Amino acid sequence: MDVKDFIRTIPDYPKPGILFRDITTLLSDPEGFRGAVDALVSLHKGAKFDVVAGIEARGFILGGAVAHQLGLGFIPVRKKGKLPFTTIGQEYDLEYGTDMVEIHTDAVKPDQRVLLIDDLIATGGTAEAAVKLIARAGGNVLASSFVIELPELGGRARLEALDIEVLSLCSFEGH
């Protein structure tokens, strides 16, 4: 199965010059969704993780399914202000300003081995913030997996500089 066949490209969204890679078509197709989840699981065959973390919002869908297949728990990495219990946060830079991701203070146990999942890696800013946040909470992100990689935006190098393995199911040139 070629995961690219299930991904829709929308030009000039959310602004002119951007090619938006829409995975809702992958998620809504039973073959595409199962194939993507199975492929993400296969990327880490034999690896030892204690928990899967997924980045809001599409990382919840994929990460939850991967955690289920691996028989592991799931940690939601959320945007600021969305979690009901005590949180810790990690700020990261956007094109114009900053944002923050958060987890509950008790989400990560000391020295837990974490697999980080999201739908797409572009610049790697959000993923890097999630890695740093999990580390501050006492965990250790060993690897990250994405359905889509936009290689020219440098996200892979950003995570690899933190000694995080980066795997993706497909890549698209142009953004």
Swiss-Prot record:
Keyword Glycosyltransferase attached: yes
Single GO BP term: adenine salvage
MF term (GO), any: AMP binding
UniProt catalytic activity: AMP + diphosphate = 5-phospho-alpha-D-ribose 1-diphosphate + adenine
InterPro entries attached to this UniProt entry: Ade_phspho_trans, PRibTrfase_dom, PRTase-like, UPRTase/APRTase
Listed CDD domains: PRTases_typeI
Complex formation: Homodimer.
Listed PANTHER family: ADENINE PHOSPHORIBOSYLTRANSFERASE
Family according to the record: Belongs to the purine/pyrimidine phosphoribosyltransferase family.
Name of the protein described by the UniProt record: Adenine phosphoribosyltransferase
Organism: Parvibaculum lavamentivorans (strain DS-1 / DSM 13023 / NCIMB 13966)
Lineage, opening ranks: Bacteria, Pseudomonadati, Pseudomonadota, Alphaproteobacteria, Hyphomicrobiales
Gene transcribed to yield this protein: apt
